[in-house]
């Protein structure tokens, strides 16, 4: 796992800025499963995250394509900023890239402490990885609309 100084400074700034902001906030990021992590750790990540997210009031959706993670999560500013920092430090994730972060008027995934699905199209997440800001959110939302997620 490697981060340049700008990424670390940006993450620190985001964390500090979101600590005391009221309302909901969201993060959308992509990362890769570390080469030395067996694919079975993904089930462990999902199970542990569901429990932890429920305690912290975080909701969201995790998509995995066999190599890439893409996740959108939402909750209080302090909680989602802390979660993003834990993900950045998690050795099972590499090449963590924040595609979007900011205030959120209404939760998108209020039904799930962590919804999880996999996709077979490995290029879908790779294409998303190149986007930032609202374009990334719109592409992610469009991808989610095409997934078979249980109600």
Predicted regions and their residues:
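Charge-rich, low-complexity N-terminal segments
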Residues: 2-151
């Amino acid at each position: 796992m490697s981060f340049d100084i700008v990424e670390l400074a940006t993450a620190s700034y985001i964390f500090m800025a979101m600590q005391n902001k009221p309302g909901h906030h969201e993060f959308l990021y992509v990362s890769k499963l570390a080469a030395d992590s067996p694919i079975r750790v993904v089930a462990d990540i999902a199970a542990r995250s569901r429990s932890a997210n429920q305690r912290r009031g975080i909701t969201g959706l995790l998509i995995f394509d066999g190599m890439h993670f893409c996740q959108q999560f939402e909750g209080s500013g302090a909680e989602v900023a802390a979660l993003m920092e834990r993900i950045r430090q998690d050795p099972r994730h590499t090449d963590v890239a924040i595609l979007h972060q900011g205030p959120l008027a209404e939760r998108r995934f209020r039904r799930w402490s962590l919804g999880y699905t996999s996709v077979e199209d490995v290029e879908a997440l790779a294409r998303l990885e190149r986007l930032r800001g609202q374009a990334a959110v719109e592409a992610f939302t469009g991808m989610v609309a095409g997934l078979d997620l249980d109600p």
